């Protein structure tokens, strides 16, 4: 059984994928080295049997293969960066290799591209010392990050550049453009090519430095000045410098290099504006004043004033009612009518003083319509209205003659001959009780209207009793006796009105 990792069929070993193949060594050097170490392969069979039988002791007696020696010698003559990568690959392979190295011949896995680990033997001590010596002779690469020199600008030069730099009018509510300047470019610490493989720690430090050198985000632009909008378009060409210097002195710089000058330029913004305006032509300033005045005049003229309302037409009937005799407090409407409020109600017709009706009904016009007049309220107690009398007579006509015995059974002493036109006391009590007045109040009403005391009510008595109940329901008190005017209004014949007879 052959030792593990030794292959006689492959004379040369493929280099790793991540390492570029350097220049080939001189002819014969590889063969000499292979021949020098070929004696180590011819060992006694007892040692080979020990390799085959005891895999745990293979780390102490294992020899290096020709492929490993050739790869190590080739790596020794390559660039220092490649040597570092080779040693790194070897150390990683040593750390990740398990303790048992016995493999079967029928292994289907792909061959390892990395070289086999180097085991410490007495034969390869010279080669290792040679490699260490050659590595020590290499110059140590400075791994510090080199930064580009930052151009230093004095505050005076930065202020001059900011004042002289022509800038277009600012757009409102838009962020400023990407900052441009010598200090705004981030330092690129990553280099391209095979000669710049850096350790992982260097990459982390470069990322940290790159994050710290990111330029500050530009603040949003200031809104435009309101005074600039009143100038017409034709005059903007003459006064563009004044507007540019005004906006340029008040805008905050977006680059980190000039950020320290923002406070100084902001404090001296008024002085720079006056200095820049004094440098302009006097004719341009006068043109700006005239243009602003014209713009204000045009704005005031554009305001439309509503036309005055047309005068109201005077009615014809009003001119016909011009009486020669008028009261002292009255006056004719000679002036124009008021345009504030239009009159919607008609004016009351004016009546002459010599008219009899005006003098007779003058007391009906009251200055205080809500004032109480107790003397004028006596009329309701004096008579019954025609409407009320007709309603009460309808109730009497529907209930007269009820509960009376027939005419041939009536006693002449108990019932008068007109008893069929009367209302029985039981029927009257039933009708009046529907008013929900107390029984003693209804008894008082019965005593006031019952003049015959026979238990029957005539038409006038029933009508007056109904009227008294309605007055009680309206809130009026019962009188001690019924006035004669009330009895007279109840005895009228319906449909006939006799005001007075002519003299005979």
From Swiss-Prot:
Keyword annotations of the record: Lipid metabolism
Comp. bias (Basic and acidic residues): 135-145, 232-244, 344-359, 373-382
Signal sequence, renumbered to the chain: none
Biased composition (Basic residues): 360-372
Keyword Cell inner membrane tagged: no
One Pfam family in the UniProt entry: EH
Listed PROSITE patterns: EH
Coiled coil residues, start to end: none
Cross-referenced Gene3D superfamilies: EF-hand
Region of interest: Disordered: 1-123, 135-264, 292-382
Similarity remark: Belongs to the IRS4 family.
Function summary: Positive regulator of phosphatidylinositol 4,5-bisphosphate turnover and negatively regulates signaling through the cell integrity pathway. Involved in rDNA silencing.
Protein name (database record): Increased rDNA silencing protein 4
Organism: Aspergillus niger (strain ATCC MYA-4892 / CBS 513.88 / FGSC A1513)
């Amino acid at each position: 059984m052959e030792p593990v990792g030794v292959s006689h069929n492959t004379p040369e070993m493929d280099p790793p994928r991540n390492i570029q193949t350097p220049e080939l060594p001189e002819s014969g050097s590889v063969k000499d080295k292979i021949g020098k170490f070929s004696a180590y392969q011819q060992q006694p069979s007892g040692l080979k049997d020990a390799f085959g039988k005891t895999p745990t002791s293979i780390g102490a007696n294992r020899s290096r293969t020709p492929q490993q020696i050739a790869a190590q010698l080739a790596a020794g003559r390559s660039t220092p960066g490649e040597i570092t990568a080779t040693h790194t690959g070897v150390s990683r392979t040593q750390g990740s290799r398990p303790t048992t190295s016995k493999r079967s011949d029928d292994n289907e896995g792909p061959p390892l591209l990395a070289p086999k680990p180097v085991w410490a033997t007495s034969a390869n001590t010279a080669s290792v010392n040679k490699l260490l010596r050659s590595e020590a002779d290499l110059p140590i690469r400075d791994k510090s990050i080199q930064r580009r020199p930052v151009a230093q600008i004095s505050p005076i030069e930065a202020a001059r550049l900011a004042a002289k730099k022509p800038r277009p009018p600012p757009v409102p509510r838009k962020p400023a453009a990407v900052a441009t300047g010598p200090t705004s470019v981030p330092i690129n610490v990553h280099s391209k090519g095979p000669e710049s493989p850096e350790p992982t720690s260097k990459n982390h430090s470069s990322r940290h430095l790159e994050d710290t050198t990111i330029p500050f985000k530009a603040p949003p632009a200031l809104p435009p000045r309101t005074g600039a909008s009143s100038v017409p378009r034709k005059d903007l060409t003459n006064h563009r410098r004044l507007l540019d210097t005004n906006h340029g002195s008040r805008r905050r710089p977006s680059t980190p290099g000039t950020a320290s000058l923002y406070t100084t330029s902001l404090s001296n913004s008024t002085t720079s504006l006056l200095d820049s305006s004094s440098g302009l032509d006097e004719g341009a300033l006068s043109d700006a004043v005239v243009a602003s005045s014209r713009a204000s005049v045009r704005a005031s003229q554009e305001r439309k004033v509503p036309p005055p309302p047309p005068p109201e037409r005077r009615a014809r009937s009003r001119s016909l009612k011009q009486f020669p005799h008028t009261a002292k407090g009255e006056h004719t409407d000679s002036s124009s009518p008021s345009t504030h409020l239009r009159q919607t109600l008609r004016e009351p017709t004016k009546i002459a003083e010599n008219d009899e009706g005006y003098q007779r009904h003058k007391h009906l016009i009251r200055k205080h319509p809500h004032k109480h007049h107790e003397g004028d309220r006596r009329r309701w107690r004096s008579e019954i209205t025609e409407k009320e009398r007709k309603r009460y007579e309808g109730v009497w006509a529907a209930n007269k003659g009820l509960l009376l015995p027939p005419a041939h059974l009536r006693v002449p002493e108990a019932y008068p001959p007109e008893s069929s036109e009367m209302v029985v006391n039981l029927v009257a009590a039933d009708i009046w009780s529907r008013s929900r007045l107390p029984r003693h109040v209804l008894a008082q009403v019965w005593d006031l209207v019952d003049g015959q005391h026979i238990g029957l009510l005539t038409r006038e008595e029933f009508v007056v009793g109904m009227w008294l109940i309605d007055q009680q329901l309206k809130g009026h008190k019962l009188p001690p006796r019924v006035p004669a005017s009330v009895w007279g209004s109840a005895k009228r014949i319906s449909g006939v009105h006799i005001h007075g007879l002519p003299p005979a």
